Amino acid sequence: MLHNPLVQFDIKKLIDIKVMDFDISFTNSAAYMLLASVLALTYFYLAFSNPRLVPSRLQISGEIIYNLVTDMLNQNVGSKGRKFVPVIFTLFVFILFCNLFGMIPYGFTVTSHIIITFALAILVFLMVTIVGFVKHGMHFLSLFLPHGTPLWLAPLMIIIELFTYLARPASLSLRLAANMMAGHILLKVIASFVITLMIYLKFLPIPLMVILIGFEIFVAILQAYIFTILSCVYLNDAVNLH
């Protein structure tokens, strides 16, 4: 029997908390975000608390992730992006661990919910906007008028560029949430069919599931990378007005 593949995305209250008319209950979503944060902190603490000249495997993996983030900033923002390493690194690691937690049996994919991804996207959007105005003042608004635009075309270009800029949080959040949700739904549906096929084909369908799980892990890592590198691209607009 095929179970509803959308059940895995249900948010459930673990601790019911209400303050006046506001529901601030502790849910499975909050629990997995907290767990992902604690695990990430523990992982990098163990990786870098006692650095060695000949690094351990844990230290190597931590350095790979750190270098990946610094390379993203250097390639997209340049040397001026170094001061943003803590923010971008935290963003990438948080999304990565939340994505990977969804691959654990009976786990919960936090980033499949648009409210979570939109909150992250809004934080990026606000950071970029604040950095742009602090660094360039009102000249930051020149971002909405591409250089060399004819005067008669300027009003239309400003409207288009402004709409594109304001749409960034929506596109950034929808891309991550949609990909994570679609991948897990597909995995759930195919897994249900594989269980049925095993009645007739014994263990032959198992390699298919292993391949699909491996692909979904790749997608989880890729989506964290895409979200972060787009954040770096947007940050470049604020820092260098490109």
UniProtKB/Swiss-Prot annotation:
Cell compartment(s), UniProt = Cell inner membrane
Q: How does it assemble?
A: F-type ATPases have 2 components, CF(1) - the catalytic core - and CF(0) - the membrane proton channel. CF(1) has five subunits: alpha(3), beta(3), gamma(1), delta(1), epsilon(1). CF(0) has three main subunits: a(1), b(2) and c(9-12). The alpha and beta chains form an alternating ring which encloses part of the gamma chain. CF(1) is attached to CF(0) by a central stalk formed by the gamma and epsilon chains, while a peripheral stalk is formed by the delta and b chains.
Cellular compartments per GO CC:
plasma membrane; proton-transporting ATP synthase complex
Q: Which gene encodes it?
A: atpB
Gene3D superfamilies membership: ATP synthase, F0 complex, subunit A
- Record GO terms (molecular function): proton-transporting ATP synthase activity, rotational mechanism
Indicate how the chain sits in the lipid bilayer. Answer: Multi-pass membrane protein
Keywords recorded for this protein, A-Z: ATP synthesis, Cell inner membrane, Cell membrane, CF(0), Hydrogen ion transport, Ion transport, Membrane, Transmembrane, Transmembrane helix, Transport
User: Short name of one Pfam family for this protein?
Assistant: ATP-synt_A
Highest taxon above the source species: Bacteria
User: What role does it play?
Assistant: Key component of the proton channel; it plays a direct role in the translocation of protons across the membrane.
Kindly indicate whether the keyword Ribonucleoprotein belongs to this entry: no
User: Could you tell me which InterPro entries the record lists for this protein?
Assistant: ATP_synth_F0_asu, ATP_synth_F0_asu_AS, ATP_synth_F0_asu_bact/mt, F0_ATP_A_sf
What protein family does this chain belong to?
A: Belongs to the ATPase A chain family.
Native species: Rickettsia bellii (strain OSU 85-389)
Give the matching NCBIfam families. ATP_synt_6_or_A (TIGR01131), PRK05815.2-4 (NF004482)
Q: Where are the transmembrane segments?
A: 29-49, 84-104, 114-134, 140-160, 189-209, 210-230
Per the record's keyword annotation, is Transmembrane included, yes or no?
Answer: yes
Q: What's the protein called, per UniProt?
A: ATP synthase subunit a
